[in-house]
């Protein structure tokens, strides 16, 4: 009805005439789902079932050509859930041509299986890097000889959302242990707000070095805005340098374009932010190199990029130059902004508490609503407790559920102030919209209930089972919902029934 460009994919499970059947590719009994009818096609993409091989892939390529369709409209399915993400056995020889190029597209079934391979957020990102970049941690390098997994970035060219004339990122992964605002802690507890995730580095991590490479990772203990920064650390030798390629971009530079960089640490070296103004990712334009003024505390620097007006920034990197050796070297990158829009977004309007539910005189749930604006990337909601503002949540929505509004035992009166700030697509914050939360009572009017014990059995273990062990990440131990075995509480088995022995604590 709104003419949204929806893409339709056909899963290789049905034939055109004879019912259910997996051909494991585009074949003689299912090609009709991809056959053109004038200028239209029944399906935009074809997802081949997982049991393909070289012969079946050859036939898929030939069938696509016969149908005058691209062979890359056919996706070779990878069963990542049962296989265990990057532990999945893949018949790469059946997928790659003599030049190492994919012959079909990749269809990733359940790539979120990564979550089952670790116990912490840091574990997740390490496994995510292996899945997408490979064990070698470099999309330009071949996989190690003793490993089977290539890494998706080794096979598929990079694409980027960093286009136009404005790009900003705080490298926010959408979760954290604290929330920082301009380098200061505003929420001192764990959170998970996926809608405020930032654009993460395109290449994690594409590095070259004349010495040992720096260790690159997300730092959840210190950030400039949001929950994490990028940390580069290690022992460095003198007379060495490091190239860390961060982003593929396509950013237009005007006379008003400026660079803002928030960073911390790095003393004992020279650190540059550099841009490639050619599509080949070469950094040969001297005007596109900006040396940072290093500081032990968070520093937000601004650079004029008008000398690059009329050019396009195709890539962004960090360059470290070490004259002398430094032990325990560390540099944190907290925020990166390239924009010619230096106007803060308009403040939200019409902020109100549309629903609330009191648990006691100090804790409540609520829903706030307001009118936002198109210049906002997301919104931060705060509560005032005494003289301090404390972050409640971050969200890209304009109707926001607040699971825990709270005030301290020494709060006075029956109302509490809330505020909402818009964070712009250029990284700037708006003025605040405020509203009053009416408790209808003072903190002395109720007592706090005794906290309920958590409904988990952290020491429970699976000690035996008639289900077979799985090579994937979703083994039988994952059936213990609520136990701390991984980031996933799913398990998978092809066996229809069986028994499990569990030891409780």
Set out the residue ranges of the language-model regions.
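Disordered, acidic Ser/Thr/Pro-rich linker "stalks" and the adjacent N-terminal cap
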Residues: 441-504
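Beta-strand-rich modules
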Residues: 403-430
